[in-house]
Amino acid sequence: VGISANIPRIGRIDRADTVNFMASDNLEQVAIDNGLWDGKGDFVFWKVIVCSYAQGRNYREREFRVFDLLAPSLGLKYGMEDFPFSVKPGSLVDVRKVMALLRDTYEGTEWDMCKNWTIDVPEKNGVPAHKEMSPLANPWLTTPMRNTLNSIAPGVIDFKRTLAVAWCSYSTVIQSRSWLPDGIGGVCWYAVDNPAQSPRIPIFCGSTKLPAAFEKCGQKEYYPN
């Protein structure tokens, strides 16, 4: 399983391994000509094609989360210099698992954006005073709301880029089943908007027409029908 969430993840390129690698003959020279590489040492793609978002690594929270959930036996730790390009899952991964990954918001982990969003509950009917999760807690906050909450209680919301986000336009899970006829063997599980809150609609590769609603883009305008 491989994942690339807006970060260059390719490492060293072995042109002799034609099964796993394919690269332009002038890749390194282009990097030199554009001031991306000095030509010294190993050519490591993700280090040469620098991505400021990656913060000096070839992964961030999303890559770590997927690898950690699918291959926990590897013992990968956030903060390591680099991660492998892909991992072998500890068990088979079906479409349901992939859909679950796309719904993930790091709930219960150190990156859970709701972990500090608590309220004080006073003592009542013999139950001692305690803290509990705010009924308003959710990982779908807008930037103005996050800023407002942090101005009231500094540090209450520590923003993390989760796998599922409220500003997603659409997401797909593509399933291929070679043992079925071509018309139904391939299916696109399609969801609009937030992957964690939207149902998935199966669109078979043999489909030649979809309902009229699919012909309208609802990203900029609301259509009641």
PLM region spans:
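C-terminus-biased signal that marks the final domain/tail of proteins
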Residues: 2-225
